[in-house]
Design a protein with these regions (language model features):
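Long, basic/Gly/Ser/Thr-rich N-terminal segments
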Residues: 1-29
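P-loop NTPase catalytic core of nucleic-acid-dependent motor ATPases
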Residues: 20-129, 143, 194-197
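AAA+/SF3 P-loop NTPase mechanochemical coupling elements
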Residues: 120-125, 158-176
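Short glycine-/polar-rich loops that comprise or flank the Walker A/P-loop
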Residues: 125-128, 152, 169-172, 188-194
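Walker B catalytic acidic pair
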Residues: 133-135, 145
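Conserved ATPase-coupling elements of RecA-like P-loop NTPase cores
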Residues: 138-143, 185-186
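Conserved catalytic/switch belt of AAA+ P-loop NTPases
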Residues: 143-165
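A short helix-turn-beta junction within AAA+ P-loop NTPase domains corresponding to the substrate/partner-engaging
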Residues: 184-203
C-alpha cells in the first residue's frame, strides 16, 4: 500500500486553465481541471460542418466562423450570449449544440433552466461552453444573472458540503428556444446577446 501511494501524483491544489494549443495537465504544482480535446485542426474540406455553420449563421457566416476560432484559440475571451430561436421543428439548433460538444468534448456541458437557478454550480462553472437546448429564463433575476455571468471575470463556485471558492470564469453561453418572443428578457439597447432566427432545414444531411 505504501509503495503504491508513493507513485500517486501530489498537487498543491486545483486550477482551471483552458488552452487548446499547449494544454498542460499540471501548472506550477496545481492540477488543471480543464480537460484536453483530442481534435487538431487540419487543412481540408469540411462540407458538412460548413453547411451547418452557413445554416445557423446565414449572412453572418464569417462572424460564426470567427466565433468558433476564438473559442479554440482564445478560450478566455468574453463573447456574446448566442441565442438561437425558431418556432419550427427540425431547424438544426440541437445539431449545432451537439457539434460544439463534439469539438470541445468534456469542456461543454448541457444545462437545464433549473441548473442556472441552483446555488450549486461546481459541475459547470469551469466549462468553456454552457449550452441549453430549451431555454426559458424569462424572470428578471434569470436575465440579470445570465448577463452578469457573460461578462464577469471571476465567479464563486459552490458544491454541496464544501466551502465556496472563487475561480476565473470564462464560460460562454449558447441557448436555444422554440419560443421566439420571450425565452429570456432582453432590454432595448442590450448588446450582450447575439440572436439568430433559424429556418427549417432543407435536408437532414447535417
Amino acid at each position: 500500500g505504501k509503495n503504491y501511494l508513493a507513485t500517486v501524483p501530489k498537487y498543491d491544489g486545483f486550477c482551471t486553465v483552458p488552452n487548446h494549443l499547449n494544454y498542460q495537465k499540471e501548472i506550477e504544482g496545481f492540477l488543471n481541471l480543464y480537460e484536453p480535446i483530442e481534435h487538431k485542426p487540419q487543412q481540408g474540406e469540411f462540407s458538412h460542418i460548413q453547411s451547418l455553420m452557413r445554416h445557423i449563421f446565414g449572412e453572418q457566416y464569417e462572424l460564426g466562423m470567427d466565433y468558433m476560432q476564438l473559442l479554440y484559440l482564445q478560450p478566455t475571451q468574453k463573447l456574446p450570449i448566442v441565442l438561437l430561436v425558431s418556432e419550427e421543428r427540425n431547424t438544426g439548433k440541437s445539431t449545432f449544440l451537439n457539434f460544439l460538444k463534439a469539438v470541445f468534448e468534456n469542456n461543454v456541458t448541457f444545462n437545464t433552466n433549473e441548473d442556472f437557478r441552483s446555488q450549486f454550480n461546481s459541475d459547470w462553472a469551469g466549462k468553456l461552453l454552457i449550452v441549453v437546448d430549451e431555454v426559458l429564463l424569462n424572470r428578471r433575476e434569470d436575465s440579470e444573472r445570465l448577463k452578469n455571468l457573460s461578462t464577469t471575470l471571476s465567479y464563486k463556485v459552490e458544491a454541496k458540503g464544501k466551502d465556496r471558492d472563487e475561480i476565473a470564469f470564462f464560460a460562454k453561453f449558447v441557448l436555444c428556444s422554440n419560443n421566439e418572443y420571450l425565452p429570456v428578457i432582453i432590454d432595448a439597447g442590450e448588446t450582450r446577446y447575439w440572436v439568430r432566427k433559424i429556418d427549417r432545414l432543407q435536408s437532414d444531411d447535417t
